[in-house]
Amino acid sequence: MGIKVCDLVMEYKKGVKVLNHVNLTIEHGIYGLLGENGAGKTTLMKILVTLLTPTSGTVEINGLTVKPENYEIIKKQIGYLPQEFGLYPNLTVREALEYVGIMSGMEKAEYQKQIDYYLEATGLSAHQKKKNRQLSGGMKRRVGLIQALLHNPSVLIVDEPTTG
Protein backbone atom coordinates (compact mmCIF):
# COMPACT_ATOMS: atom_id res chain seq x y z
CA MET A 1 0.00 0.00 0.00
CA GLY A 2 1.01 3.64 -0.13
CA ILE A 3 1.50 5.67 -3.30
CA LYS A 4 2.61 4.37 -6.69
CA VAL A 5 3.26 6.66 -9.66
CA CYS A 6 3.91 5.08 -13.07
CA ASP A 7 5.20 6.91 -16.15
CA LEU A 8 3.50 10.16 -15.10
CA VAL A 9 3.56 13.04 -17.59
CA MET A 10 2.07 16.49 -17.06
CA GLU A 11 2.06 19.18 -19.73
CA TYR A 12 0.64 22.61 -18.98
CA LYS A 13 1.47 24.04 -22.39
CA LYS A 14 1.91 22.07 -25.57
CA GLY A 15 5.41 20.66 -25.55
CA VAL A 16 6.36 21.94 -22.07
CA LYS A 17 6.44 18.99 -19.69
CA VAL A 18 6.36 19.81 -15.99
CA LEU A 19 6.54 16.11 -15.12
CA ASN A 20 8.34 13.87 -17.60
CA HIS A 21 7.74 10.12 -17.16
CA VAL A 22 7.95 10.13 -13.35
CA ASN A 23 8.04 6.75 -11.60
CA LEU A 24 7.81 6.65 -7.84
CA THR A 25 6.80 4.22 -5.10
CA ILE A 26 6.18 5.52 -1.59
CA GLU A 27 5.46 3.05 1.20
CA HIS A 28 3.72 4.23 4.37
CA GLY A 29 6.06 6.44 6.37
CA ILE A 30 7.35 9.99 6.34
CA TYR A 31 8.91 11.28 3.14
CA GLY A 32 9.90 14.59 1.63
CA LEU A 33 10.18 15.79 -1.96
CA LEU A 34 13.12 18.07 -2.62
CA GLY A 35 13.74 20.04 -5.76
CA GLU A 36 14.28 23.46 -7.22
CA ASN A 37 11.48 25.93 -7.75
CA GLY A 38 9.48 24.90 -10.78
CA ALA A 39 10.60 21.25 -10.57
CA GLY A 40 7.00 20.00 -10.42
CA LYS A 41 6.66 19.09 -6.73
CA THR A 42 3.38 20.96 -6.23
CA THR A 43 2.05 19.68 -9.56
CA LEU A 44 2.76 16.10 -8.46
CA MET A 45 1.02 16.69 -5.13
CA LYS A 46 -2.03 18.19 -6.85
CA ILE A 47 -2.25 15.12 -9.08
CA LEU A 48 -2.01 12.84 -6.03
CA VAL A 49 -4.92 14.61 -4.32
CA THR A 50 -7.06 14.69 -7.51
CA LEU A 51 -6.87 18.46 -8.09
CA LEU A 52 -5.11 17.97 -11.44
CA THR A 53 -5.40 15.28 -14.09
CA PRO A 54 -2.08 14.21 -15.64
CA THR A 55 -1.51 14.20 -19.38
CA SER A 56 -0.62 10.50 -19.15
CA GLY A 57 0.51 7.86 -16.71
CA THR A 58 -1.12 6.32 -13.66
CA VAL A 59 -1.27 6.95 -9.93
CA GLU A 60 -2.42 4.55 -7.22
CA ILE A 61 -3.23 5.47 -3.64
CA ASN A 62 -3.45 2.48 -1.30
CA GLY A 63 -3.92 0.19 -4.30
CA LEU A 64 -6.75 2.26 -5.84
CA THR A 65 -6.15 3.89 -9.24
CA VAL A 66 -6.65 7.65 -9.20
CA LYS A 67 -9.37 8.25 -11.79
CA PRO A 68 -12.65 10.18 -11.71
CA GLU A 69 -14.83 7.26 -10.66
CA ASN A 70 -12.58 6.67 -7.61
CA TYR A 71 -12.10 10.32 -6.56
CA GLU A 72 -14.61 10.27 -3.68
CA ILE A 73 -13.08 7.13 -2.15
CA ILE A 74 -9.55 8.45 -2.59
CA LYS A 75 -10.37 11.86 -1.11
CA LYS A 76 -11.46 10.14 2.09
CA GLN A 77 -8.02 8.51 2.34
CA ILE A 78 -6.02 11.70 1.78
CA GLY A 79 -5.46 14.76 3.92
CA TYR A 80 -3.98 17.70 2.03
CA LEU A 81 -2.47 20.93 3.29
CA PRO A 82 -1.61 23.02 0.23
CA GLN A 83 1.13 25.62 0.03
CA GLU A 84 -1.49 28.36 -0.26
CA PHE A 85 -4.74 27.66 1.50
CA GLY A 86 -7.66 29.81 2.45
CA LEU A 87 -9.70 29.97 5.60
CA TYR A 88 -13.01 31.76 5.59
CA PRO A 89 -12.01 34.98 7.39
CA ASN A 90 -15.37 35.54 9.10
CA LEU A 91 -15.69 32.04 10.54
CA THR A 92 -14.26 31.18 13.92
CA VAL A 93 -11.60 28.51 14.14
CA ARG A 94 -14.17 26.02 15.47
CA GLU A 95 -16.73 26.93 12.79
CA ALA A 96 -14.15 26.41 10.05
CA LEU A 97 -13.26 22.99 11.45
CA GLU A 98 -16.91 22.00 11.91
CA TYR A 99 -17.54 22.92 8.27
CA VAL A 100 -14.80 20.49 7.19
CA GLY A 101 -16.29 17.77 9.39
CA ILE A 102 -19.73 18.28 7.84
CA MET A 103 -18.36 18.36 4.28
CA SER A 104 -16.36 15.18 4.97
CA GLY A 105 -19.58 13.37 5.90
CA MET A 106 -18.47 12.72 9.46
CA GLU A 107 -20.95 12.23 12.29
CA LYS A 108 -21.24 15.35 14.48
CA ALA A 109 -20.06 13.60 17.65
CA GLU A 110 -17.04 12.22 15.78
CA TYR A 111 -15.89 15.51 14.27
CA GLN A 112 -16.51 17.40 17.54
CA LYS A 113 -14.29 14.89 19.37
CA GLN A 114 -11.58 15.17 16.69
CA ILE A 115 -11.76 18.98 16.74
CA ASP A 116 -11.35 19.07 20.53
CA TYR A 117 -8.42 16.66 20.35
CA TYR A 118 -6.56 18.55 17.61
CA LEU A 119 -7.24 22.00 19.08
CA GLU A 120 -5.64 20.82 22.31
CA ALA A 121 -2.76 19.06 20.52
CA THR A 122 -1.90 22.18 18.48
CA GLY A 123 -2.31 24.68 21.32
CA LEU A 124 -5.31 26.34 19.67
CA SER A 125 -8.02 25.49 22.23
CA ALA A 126 -7.93 29.00 23.71
CA HIS A 127 -8.30 30.48 20.22
CA GLN A 128 -11.22 28.42 18.91
CA LYS A 129 -13.70 31.32 19.19
CA LYS A 130 -11.44 33.75 17.32
CA LYS A 131 -12.23 34.65 13.74
CA ASN A 132 -9.72 33.24 11.28
CA ARG A 133 -8.80 36.77 10.20
CA GLN A 134 -7.51 37.39 13.75
CA LEU A 135 -4.98 34.56 13.66
CA SER A 136 -1.26 34.74 12.98
CA GLY A 137 0.14 32.97 9.92
CA GLY A 138 1.41 30.07 12.03
CA MET A 139 -1.95 29.68 13.74
CA LYS A 140 -3.72 29.64 10.38
CA ARG A 141 -1.32 26.96 9.20
CA ARG A 142 -2.18 24.84 12.27
CA VAL A 143 -5.91 25.25 11.56
CA GLY A 144 -5.20 24.08 8.00
CA LEU A 145 -3.33 21.07 9.35
CA ILE A 146 -6.27 20.17 11.60
CA GLN A 147 -8.56 20.42 8.58
CA ALA A 148 -6.31 17.99 6.71
CA LEU A 149 -6.21 15.53 9.62
CA LEU A 150 -9.81 15.79 10.79
CA HIS A 151 -11.19 12.81 8.85
CA ASN A 152 -8.29 10.49 9.87
CA PRO A 153 -6.70 10.06 6.45
CA SER A 154 -4.25 7.23 5.84
CA VAL A 155 -2.14 9.55 3.65
CA LEU A 156 -1.22 13.15 4.55
CA ILE A 157 0.28 15.38 1.88
CA VAL A 158 1.70 18.73 2.99
CA ASP A 159 3.07 21.19 0.44
CA GLU A 160 5.81 23.42 1.90
CA PRO A 161 5.62 21.87 5.39
CA THR A 162 8.16 24.23 6.96
CA THR A 163 6.36 27.48 6.10
CA GLY A 164 4.14 29.23 8.62
Q: Can you name each region flagged by the protein language model?
A:
Residues 49:
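Helix-to-loop junction immediately C-terminal to a conserved catalytic motif
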Residues 57-67, 73-74:
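Conserved ABC transporter NBD signature motif
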Residues 98, 102, 109-127:
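Conserved ABC ATPase "signature" region
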